[in-house]
């Protein structure tokens, strides 16, 4: 009985310690999710409204470039998910969805990374060109368009940083659910393997 009561008390103490440790992370997590929403929305708005007309070279829109279209879609999806995850975070049964949120946080971070890479490559080529394939830079003619695209990519990168931090926090929350094996359980398993009776203190 003493052994059982001791293990129960230890488990309760460990659970209480987890709650104390997780509390600051909950606040940080909520803050990051709230910050990610305006960053992603601003990135979408800056890119989706981006166009410029030049008398000599015509009109250029974000939709003309696949990398920019991809960035808009990914940021829109990320913003919607951020709002949904904020609503889930306010519910008491959030622990039921810890694994789902962990997976979606990881996926959002990877998608934001790929969209930032794709859009940044387009911006770089627009600013610097590519001499190997005889592509000239175009930002000297479409400076406002390039500037808005750069701002959108920067906002996307800021949202990415939020989700990188969220990925770490959600991973911490998920994996702290697993308790390390107690000393009594380890002794019992070792005794069973050796064929010896277990003596409880």
Curated annotation (Swiss-Prot):
Protein localization: Cell membrane
Oligomer status and interactors: Homodimer and heterodimers.
GO CC field: plasma membrane
Family: Belongs to the Casparian strip membrane proteins (CASP) family.
Membrane topology note: Multi-pass membrane protein
Originating species: Oryza sativa subsp. indica (Rice)
Highest rank taxon of the organism: Eukaryota
Name assigned to this protein: CASP-like protein 2D1
Family annotation (InterPro entries): CASP/CASPL, CASP_dom
Region listing for Disordered, in residue ranges: 180-201
Chain ranges on the Cytoplasmic side, renumbered to this chain: 1-26, 92-98, 170-201
Keyword Magnesium: no
Transmembrane segments: 27-47, 71-91, 99-119, 149-169
Extracellular side: 48-70, 120-148
Keywords of this entry: Cell membrane, Membrane, Transmembrane, Transmembrane helix
Polar residues bias (residue ranges): 180-194
Stored Pfam families: CASP_dom (PF04535)
Coarse class of the protein's main subcellular location: membrane
């Amino acid at each position: 009985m003493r052994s059982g009561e001791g293990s129960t008390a230890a488990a309760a103490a460990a659970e209480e310690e987890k709650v104390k440790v997780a509390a600051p992370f909950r606040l940080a997590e909520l803050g990051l999710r709230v910050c990610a929403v305006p960053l992603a929305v601003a990135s979408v708005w800056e890119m989706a409204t981006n166009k410029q007309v030049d008398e000599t070279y015509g009109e250029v829109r974000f939709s003309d470039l696949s990398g920019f279209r991809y960035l808009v879609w990914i940021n829109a999806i990320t913003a919607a998910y951020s709002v949904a995850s904020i609503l889930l975070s306010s519910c008491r049964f959030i622990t039921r969805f810890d694994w789902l949120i962990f997976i979606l946080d990881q996926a959002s971070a990877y998608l934001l990374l790929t969209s930032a890479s794709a859009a940044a490559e387009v911006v770089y080529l627009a600013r610097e060109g590519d001499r190997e394939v005889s592509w000239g830079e175009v930002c000297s003619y479409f400076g406002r368009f390039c500037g808005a695209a750069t701002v959108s990519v920067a906002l996307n990168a800021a949202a990415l940083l939020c989700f990188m931090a969220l990925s770490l926090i959600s991973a911490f929350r998920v994996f702290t659910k697993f308790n390390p094996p107690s000393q009594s359980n380890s002794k019992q398993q070792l005794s069973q393997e050796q064929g010896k009776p277990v003596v409880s203190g």
